[in-house]
Each structure stands twice: as C-alpha cells, then as structure tokens.
Amino acid sequence: MCGFIVSLGLDLNQNDFKNALNHLSRRGPDSEGIWSENKIFLGSRRLAIFDLNDRSNQPMQSLCSRYILVFNGSIYNYKSLRKHLIDNDVKLKTYSDTEVILELFALEGPQMVSKLKGMFAFVIWDCKKKEAFAARDPYGIKPLFIGTNSKGIILASQVKTLLLTKQISTERDINSQFSFWNLGYIIEPRTWFKNIKALKSGYYVRIKDGKIISEMQWYDLSKNWISADKNKQRISKKECNKIIKNSLTSSVKKHLVSDVPIGIFLSSGVDSTLVAGIVSSNTKKKIIAITVSFENFEGSENDESIKAKKIAQKYGMEHHIYRVTQKDFQNDLPEILEAMDQPTIDGVNVWYASKAAA
C-alpha cells in the first residue's frame, strides 16, 4: 500500500504538510515525494509493487506536464491498458500502473475510471484548469478521506494524517460514535470527526477553488444484484459450484501480477485455504504463507497454526508462523492503536500478519 495527502487552497505551511506526510511512512517506506505550486500541495509515500525503479515514484507528472498524480493501490489489468496507450502513440517512460492511470486520464478524461480493474484511490491535479479529480474503487478497498474547512479541502489516505495538518476541526460526529458503539465500526462516508468524510466507494469528485463542484457515482454495485434478480434461472448445485470456482479463480489470478514476492495470510479457514489452493495452481513463483498464532490458544482447537501448517505443506508453500504472547500484545498495543486510523473492534490479526510479512 501507499499513502498520500493533497492540500487544495489552504493556508498550510510546508513543515506541517511534511509532518502529516511523514505520518504515512508506514504505508509507503520506499520513497517520499512532494509537488507544490502556490497553495497546492501533493505528497506521496510509496510502497513499490510494480516497476521498482525510482522513475515510478510519486507525485508523477504526465508527459504533457498538465497533470500531477498521487495514487494508492494496484491496477491488475494495467498491462492491457498500457498496450492500449501505446497503440494510441503514447510514449510511456515507465512500466508502472501509476503512469497508466495518469496517461489514460490525459487521453480519455474521467470516464477512464471504468476501465480500471483493481483497488485504488487517487487524486489528479489539473495544472491548466486548476482543479482536482479524485476517485475510489468500486468496493472502497483503498481509503480516501476528505477534510474541509472554510478556506479549502485536504484529501488523504488516513484520517489522522488530515488532523496532523492542524487545518481540520476535531469536533466529533455523534452519529459516528453511535455507529461504533452499536456495530463495532463506523459506517462510511462518516468518520469519527464531523468535518472529515470518506469518498464513497465507486465515486469520483471534482474540486475547484477549495470546493467540491461535482460528485459522480461511476460504479453502482447494487446494479449487479438487480441484474441477477431480473435474470433468475434455476441451476444445479454442480453448475453453481463451477460458476463460483471460475469467478474466484479468475479474480485470484489477476492478483498474482507483481514485481515483488507474493504472500498469503493463511488462517486455515475455508476462504484463505481456497485462495491458497488457487494460487498454488496458477503460479510457479515461490509463495510465502503467514499464520498468526496466539499463545493462549496454542495446542487447542482454536490454534489455527496446526491446520494452516498442513495446508501450507499440501500446497508447497514456505510457511511462517508468527506467535503472539500476552506480553507481546501488551507491548504492541500502543502501536496497534496508532496504526488504527478509525475506531474498530477488528484488525488485530491483520496487524500482526502484516508485521510478520514486513
């Protein structure tokens, strides 16, 4: 994952901007970059996945110099989109998905988002029109938050990053608190703070003169359900299994595109076991499997590492078990809470699995 922050029209000094950007270092340890012009700041922390060369660092400027991009995510069909650009005489300088997004936008404008297959959040600054374009993937896998005050707008990958700019009010949203205490998480687009909202999944916005001038839903997941409801047909269990298997296999195969080693979080549950099986059948690369095991459950039926070890052996994966003691948890709790951008009852297992992978 990467992280970015974009300030549009606020009285933000460069030191406060850099301090906020540094907060994103855990999201992007490989490089840092800043582009600025008058009261416009774009900052990025990169985790390199495709084209590990410095030429793919961000913020990235388009070939025509008109557009500046910061981006978090992965575009799994970027190679076919790259070919499309080359076929249109675009002289690309990198092999990254970042440049593909940037030049596709320069070529086709906002409608290009419908061609992207993957998880993403990005902001593009148009130096000619003096406006920003921000978009988020259909499922909201990658975060994008928008903070506002009377003078302008700041966008960032994390809520805490926005607060560190000292430009956004910390007044809390009572409805968000109600959501957390009842559900264990906050329902988007709300956040814990009144003046910070998430960009909705499958939406894009245009921002000019410190204000959102248009908001568009470019992908509506509910239409998939409506389509399925209209086209009801009885199928056998065997046919159903085949459809699910083909769809899952197709999705997992798309995720195997990478210029860095591939790993899997293996919990021994049905879902991660299925993914492990599909991965092992569709790549010759060495796959690393990581399982988190808690000391209190060791040796019991709740110890997932026992089954996970057998699954990893079955699929020929290099297996790493990360054991967590009660003392480990007590020591790590402050860092876990710091990494937790919004209140939630979930995420501890993923935090430890990510720590093991790092």
Regions found by a protein language model. Give the residues of each.
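Cysteine-centered catalytic environments shared across enzyme families
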Residues: 1-341, 350, 354
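Active-site nucleotide-sugar/metal-binding loop of Leloir-type enzymes
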Residues: 356-358
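Catalytic subdomain that performs nucleotidyl-dependent activation
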Residues: 345-346
